[in-house]
Amino acid sequence: SIRKYTQEALSPEAVKTILEAGLLAPSSKRCTPWEFIAVEDNETLARLSECKTSGAKPIAGAALAIVVTADMTLTDTWIEDASIAAILMQLQAADLGLGSCWIQVRGRFGAMDEPAEDFVRETLGIPEEMGVLCILSIGHKDEERKPFDEEKMMWEKVHIGKW
């Protein structure tokens, strides 16, 4: 996860490419319950960064936030389907040399124990039937993170054929 970004805007082509990755994501029974809100307005980004008590600050410094929602009335796998779309957008951003961070919204709380989902829903006018899963903050990296150490991979967590 990259949490610090430069002030450089993303090209319209980059934004489109990232969103296409989400739109092309697989979903259970091809019901495609997810819908995305792409936010580039600094004032709205700052507001969204206040959706929960901790962990959402990277949104304020990002060039783009993608709010990942899904229609809860279409399928009981909306969380899984939206998660696949979200991670594919993060992988696409990485492929473009950009940084991103998954900010969990579903099941989290903001000030005065207000559900973060309600805060985001009210801020962006999201209908009640849409579950708000997460917000992806995306931008040009202003930090580098050390990659995972392959020598510390926990292969004992992999089971072949049976437990």
Where are these regions (language model features)?
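Acidic, surface-exposed loops and disordered segments
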Residues: S1-W163
